């Protein structure tokens, strides 16, 4: 029954991931870049097989693991003379990313054997978190990387309880390869986290067949290591740029654009995206520390501390860099959520885990959730007034979240376990319904509203073929390049054709799209 429930939650995540998947254009970072690299892989433009390019130049930012899968989808869904649709670009990352929902529950099942409630709660938390659901459906590497990391940890946990040591060793090796072919530098903290947890509990001593497990790992590592060796063989010292100049070296040493807040960026992302489960985290950290000698305590603390220690000091901080933190956060918070539902039953079912700390405060969390739900419903009412006009687009989200959280908090206060289960269902359904509404609207890709739309400008560039076009007054935009099917770099002076949203004097206008014009200037 546990596996059926986990599979059902995984199916729900897949349905959620596909809602409105192709309705909005690709955003600049990093969807349009990923799409272009995938298209050039499909077209075979590299100097050798499996070597990625971007506008016919070597692409040295990431290995082509996900790009290659997107290229396969493009081959299956797109005519050779067509630009691939947004749906075909986002499909592979969306499907792969939603696998973290059942895998997270399975991981918890291994950390807390027999604790079905905590396993299901882990999957529920991963299903309902906005950052996990939203970043997973973008044509980016972060969601797929989270799934690979979950399966890597799961395979390592299986080695001391399974007779199929070589199989699980191979799975661990393959997931290491997968991470090498996604964001390769992130493999280091993910592997260190697992190694710390294994060393803390000396778990490798109980592996059933260490030679078979290690052989499986080596075989599984072959694809990832093989590609990097192939890359180095063809491109020489340029291949090191993937690790140093444009990989770990850049994010460790160079404070890129949008990194003004430094280490606060991942903390802000967690504070913004962790609702409604975020209030459980402080209690969970204390509880896990009290039981740091248990497998759950060791792994959840080691993984969160190691990943947090790797992410917080980065000089370049972008919102999606915090994405790996959501898996250990879910592993930490889920047993507390299960305890809120089952209370005395939880300590009997998992006798090695005592009641959590500060129970008197923890038991007041349902009222807090209920209050948040009422506040959201109040904001929905305010949206009908003259002062709440800006809230109108969020009215439906406020209603479903408010009802879900208010009802969930109220039922979780009940003395009856059945009503408390209904409370968790209400909280979860409120979040899932809100995510479904969000993904069915233009609101889910809010970065598109932060600057001008590229598609009319791209159509203007496509309709007027000729010599190279430059973009005046703005930095180069990968999404404009994608839809224009040509690279349009920033204008830095001199004669030539240029796009601008300002009047272009002493130029020959070749086309107009709204306030934008394409002109040939001398």
Please describe what each predicted stretch is.
Residues 18, 33-58, 65-68, 72-79:
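Extracytosolic helix-loop segments that constitute the early lumenal/periplasmic catalytic or substrate-binding loops
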Residues 34-44, 174-182, 187-296, 303-322, ...:
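Transmembrane-lumen/periplasm boundary regions of multi-pass, lipid-linked membrane glycan transferases
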Residues 3, 166-174, 207, 287-522:
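Membrane-embedded architecture of ER/inner-membrane glycosylation machinery
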Residues 109-114, 152-171, 179, 289, ...:
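Membrane-interface transmembrane helices that cradle and orient dolichyl/undecaprenyl
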Residues 86, 93, 134-145, 184-185:
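Short acidic/glycine- and proline-prone juxtamembrane loop motifs at membrane-interface regions
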Residues 3, 9, 104-128:
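Transmembrane-helix signature of polytopic, membrane-embedded enzymes
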Residues 87, 91-113, 151:
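Transmembrane-helix motifs of polytopic, lipid-linked glycan transferases
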Residues 103, 144-162, 175, 329-332:
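Specific aromatic-rich, kink-prone transmembrane helix
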């Amino acid at each position: 029954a546990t596996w059926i429930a986990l599979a059902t939650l995984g199916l729900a995540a897949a349905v959620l991931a596909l809602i409105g998947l192709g309705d909005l254009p690709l955003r600049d970072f990093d969807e349009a870049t990923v799409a272009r690299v995938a298209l050039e892989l499909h077209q075979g433009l590299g100097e050798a097989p499996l070597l990625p390019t971007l506008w016919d130049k070597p692409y040295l930012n990431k290995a082509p693991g996900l790009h290659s899968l997107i290229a396969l989808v493009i081959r299956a869904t797109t005519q050779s003379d067509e630009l691939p649709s947004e749906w075909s670009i986002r499909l592979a990352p969306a499907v792969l990313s939603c696998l973290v929902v059942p895998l997270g529950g399975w991981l918890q099942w291994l950390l807390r054997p027999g604790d079905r409630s905590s396993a299901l709660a882990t999957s529920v938390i991963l299903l309902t978190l906005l950052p996990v659901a939203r970043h997973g459906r973008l044509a980016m590497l972060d969601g797929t990387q989270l799934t690979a990391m979950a399966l890597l940890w799961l395979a390592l946990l299986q080695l001391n309880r399974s007779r199929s040591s070589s199989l699980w060793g191979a799975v661990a090796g393959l997931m290491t390869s997968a991470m090498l072919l996604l964001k390769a530098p992130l493999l280091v903290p993910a592997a260190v986290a697992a190694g710390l947890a294994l060393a803390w509990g000396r778990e490798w001593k109980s592996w059933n067949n260490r030679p078979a497990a290690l052989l499986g790992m080596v075989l599984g590592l072959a694809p990832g290591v093989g590609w990097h060796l192939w890359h180095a063989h063809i491109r020489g010292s340029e291949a090191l740029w993937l690790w140093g100049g444009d990989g770990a070296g850049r994010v460790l040493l160079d404070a890129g654009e949008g990194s003004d807040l430094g280490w606060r960026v991942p903390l802000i992302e967690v504070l913004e995206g962790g609702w409604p489960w975020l209030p459980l985290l402080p209690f969970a950290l204390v509880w896990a520390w009290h039981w740091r000698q248990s497998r759950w305590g060791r792994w959840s603390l080691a993984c969160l501390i190691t990943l947090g220690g790797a992410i917080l000091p980065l000089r370049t901080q972008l919102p999606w860099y915090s994405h790996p933190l959501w898996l250990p956060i879910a592993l930490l918070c889920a047993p507390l959520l299960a305890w809120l539902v089952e209370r005395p039953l939880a300590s009997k079912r998992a006798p090695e885990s005592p009641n959590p700390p500060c129970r008197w405060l923890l038991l007041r969390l349902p009222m807090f959730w209920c209050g948040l739900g009422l506040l959201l419903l109040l904001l929905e009412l305010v949206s009908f007034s003259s002062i709440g006009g800006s809230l109108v687009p969020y009215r439906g989200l406020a209603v479903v979240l408010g009802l879900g959280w208010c009802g969930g908090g109220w039922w979780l206060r009940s003395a009856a376990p059945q009503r408390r289960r209904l409370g968790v269902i209400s909280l979860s359904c409120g979040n899932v319904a809100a995510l479904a509404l969000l993904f069915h609207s233009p609101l889910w890709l809010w970065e598109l509203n932060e600057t001008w739309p590229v598609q009319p400008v791209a159509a203007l560039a496509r309709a007027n073929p000729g010599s190279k076009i430059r973009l005046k007054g703005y930095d180069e935009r990968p999404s404009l390049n994608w839809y224009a099917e040509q690279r349009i770099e920033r204008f830095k002076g001199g004669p030539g054709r240029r796009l601008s949203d300002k009047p272009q004097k002493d130029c020959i206008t070749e086309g107009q799209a709204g306030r934008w014009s394409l002109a040939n200037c001398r």
